Design a protein with these regions (language model features):
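Cytosolic juxtamembrane amphipathic/interface segments immediately preceding
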Residues: 66-82, 217-221
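Hydrophobic alpha-helical membrane-embedded segments
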Residues: 15-42, 187-202
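Alpha-helical transmembrane segments
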Residues: 133-139, 266-276, 300-303
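Alpha-helical transmembrane segments and their membrane-interface junctions
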Residues: 91-106, 168-172, 178, 235-252
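Long, contiguous internal "core" modules enriched in hydrophobic/ aromatic residues
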Residues: 103-220
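Membrane-interface amphipathic/juxtamembrane segments adjacent to transmembrane helices
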Residues: 28-72
């Protein structure tokens, strides 16, 4: 009876998780596209209202004209739409699914005795600690390095090193399948933490300042933008980590940590290609094909590495 109920819980939670993830990723990708595609307004009325960018689009038989204000709009509308439940429900359903699939049966799915033989309670505690410790370390990197000269580059390198270390540890402590999923959950937890602890609180402070007739502190917009950009680069690595559970040849490799890092790097590079492609179409930057090339090359490198291992064992 228990296994039957767990199967149903797994199915329903997985379904809900996919639905909410699609909603979150869709809205996130749209706003990255929107920010990258805005052009200075031509209408003088818009300029006088403080509009810094506009976009004209056609979709579904209608024309759309979203605008972005440089600071605060002259007046807030009665119905102001917020984007946060997409993130929160994705994390809640994802962690629930992780609990049902891995933590509930830690001895079977989380632990591989040939990798590390430990008590299920200890493995569960360390798995949860992975989610929390990574977020704290990542947050400190953003705080301490983000405002320095070349801060974005320093943060990028710091976070990349942190992800590599976490990937190596996970693959040497847990079963390969669980390790890949855990790294995906770790990054996804950080993405939702960015929304809950920085993006939304900053936006609430901005709204409160406007309602009080006070100037808006630009630091909230800067911090929110920084974390939002990080989230968009985490997205494709997270998707690979989640989907890898269906392909045992990735996580069963002796150097599975290296395969995981290479594929996540490919995802981040490919995402960079699409982000910069919007600016290229407007003449703001060079063609981002090198990022696509790097991302695509990482995939056959991973394939070659996996194939070489299979050949040695045939």
């Amino acid at each position: 009876m228990e296994s039957y109920l767990l199967d149903w819980a797994n199915l329903l939670l997985r379904w809900a998780h996919v639905i909410t993830a699609i909603a979150w990723i869709g809205s996130s990708f749209y706003f990255v596209f929107l920010d990258s595609s805005l052009t200075p307004p031509e209408d003088q009325d818009l300029k006088q209202q403080g509009v810094s960018g506009e976009l004209w689009a056609v979709h579904g038989g209608g024309f759309y004209h979203p605008v972005k204000f440089a600071g605060a709009p002259p007046k807030l509308p009665q119905n102001l739409h917020w984007f946060y439940w997409e993130s929160y429900t994705t994390w809640l359903t994802g962690f629930s699914l992780f609990t049902v699939s891995y933590l509930w049966n830690a001895r079977t799915y989380l632990i591989d005795a040939s990798v590390r033989a430990w008590h299920p309670h200890a493995a569960i505690a360390v798995a949860i600690a992975f989610l929390l410790v990574f977020w704290v370390a990542y947050d400190q990197i953003c705080r301490r390095l983000g405002q320095r000269k070349n801060g974005d580059a320093l943060v990028g390198v710091g976070v990349a090193v942190l992800v590599c270390i976490a990937s190596w540890l996970a693959c040497h402590w847990f079963s390969g399948r669980a390790a890949f999923l855990l790294i995906g959950a770790m990054l996804a937890t950080t993405m939702t933490a960015n929304v809950a602890h920085w993006i939304i609180p900053g936006q609430r402070k901005m709204v409160a300042s406007i309602q009080a007739g006070e100037p808006v502190d630009p630091i909230h917009g800067w911090r929110g933008k920084q974390r939002s950009v990080h989230n968009t680069y985490f997205t494709l690595p997270v998707l690979f980590a989640m989907l890898s559970n269906h392909y045992s040849f990735t996580y069963s490799h002796p150097q599975n940590w290296l395969v995981l890092i290479l594929m996540m790097f490919a995802g981040a590079a490919i995402r960079q290609f699409f982000v910069l492609r919007h600016g290229f179409k407007l003449g703001r930057n060079k063609h981002p094909w090198p990022y696509a090339a790097v991302g695509v090359v990482a995939i056959p490198v991973s394939y070659t590495h996996l194939r070489a291992h299979e050949t040695r064992h045939d």
